[in-house]
Amino acid sequence: MPQVQNDNRFEHLLDHHHLKKTGPRLRVLSMMSSKNTATSQPDLENLMHDVDRVTLYRILNVFEEKGIIHKVFDLNGTANYAICHSNCEEHNHQDEHLHFNCTVCNNVYCLNDLNLPSINLPAGFKAENFTLYASGLCPKCSKKENKK
């Protein structure tokens, strides 16, 4: 099991969203923040053997509702979760960035630093959220591919 730190920023984040600071919640945040890719519930289940599936589902659900994490789907349709930027609010996600799906390792990356084009919707349309996907090879898989 990976090393997990109980970080004060996670306690502050839970306080900010009026959530109890439970061990499983703090561990989920720590595990998710330690990765540079989005994480699926099955991946978290494999790391957190002492937390049952229903509890983990509820943690992910409340974190998404509160704007702590956002959901992104991989190429297989599996929901993955990543920590939101600090400007997300309850029921109002601001994580409008490119999500990159690697076609080899199946990891999902949030590419937050890219400038996205503005989208002008036709009259009468109102976007409530926005998701942009790209797929291909991540740097690690691309490097392996080039060595062949």
What spans do the regions from the language model cover?
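Short helix-coil-helix linker/hinge
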Residues: 19-25
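Short, Lys/Arg-enriched N-terminal segment that forms or immediately precedes the first helix
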Residues: 4-18
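Short coil turns linking two alpha-helices in DNA-binding domains
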Residues: 51-52
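Non-DNA-binding regulatory cores of transcription-related proteins
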Residues: 66, 70-148
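Short acidic, hydrophobic short linear motifs in intrinsically disordered regions
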Residues: 38-45
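Basic amphipathic alpha-helical segments that dock to polyanions
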Residues: 56, 60-66
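Pre-recognition alpha-helix immediately N-terminal to the DNA-recognition helix
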Residues: 26-31
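Short helix-capping/hinge SLiMs at alpha-helix to coil transitions
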Residues: 19, 33-36
